[in-house]
């Protein structure tokens, strides 16, 4: 049977989401799988909606795993996966929180059934840096920026494009994505002046794409790059060394959208077919 997990984590002290083979590197996947396996007394392999990089956070991550029904017949679970929330809260470190465990609807796949992923990048240009209570999820930028110039640079990126200039190379992986939203917001307050957020939404993202999009717009906003910088990058045919990558600490995955339950399987099949048809896709 398939189980859906809804979880959050502070990515600061993790080497990203993905387990690194047999390595003891601390990753979100390794910590979760090890603890789930201990509770369920069976090996667990997680599939996730968004494979976040080292230092990137999540407040809305979704994963799934398959497990024999008998593994849920523990005395403390009694076949009710929701009881895993309390069990895991006693075992997991403070920088991971699993807040939802449920039977997955038929056809659900955390990765391929997803319609879109939502990210927020949080950054301050104040010379004092971020609030001490937000220092782990807010990046500091050393120069003032023009938010309207950044929005103009972001607008040209909306739509279906090959974002190869913004993506780190990955063998046999497509870099074609549909960027559905990229908006900049001044969210300054009296206690957090010169604070900005980028809201970025796409059907999926390739490795390092969001941080490269943000860094490119910030370069335009501070005047280091011309206003047509991002438009020029869209014409590239390979990863550009000119693309600045924003620090990981400012980025958070904040949500994953799925279709209605009766459309989950069709969406997963459609996504697999499209990825397979794209140039360079596996």
Swiss-Prot record:
It catalyses: uridine(38/39/40) in tRNA = pseudouridine(38/39/40) in tRNA. The active site is at 53 (nucleophile). Transmembrane segments: none annotated. Gene3D superfamilies: Pseudouridine synthase I, catalytic domain, C-terminal subdomain, Pseudouridine synthase I, catalytic domain, N-terminal subdomain. Coiled coil: none annotated. GO terms for biological process: tRNA pseudouridine synthesis. Keywords: Isomerase, tRNA processing. It comes from the Bacteria. InterPro entries: PsdUridine_synth_cat_dom_sf, PsdUridine_synth_TruA, PsdUridine_synth_TruA_a/b_dom, PsdUridine_synth_TruA_C, TruA/RsuA/RluB/E/F_N. Substrate binds at residue 119. It is an enzyme of class 5 (isomerase). The keyword Transport does not apply. Homodimer. NCBIfam families: hisT_truA. Belongs to the tRNA pseudouridine synthase TruA family. PANTHER family: PSEUDOURIDYLATE SYNTHASE (PTHR11142), TRNA PSEUDOURIDINE SYNTHASE-LIKE 1 (PTHR11142:SF0). Formation of pseudouridine at positions 38, 39 and 40 in the anticodon stem and loop of transfer RNAs. This is tRNA pseudouridine synthase A.
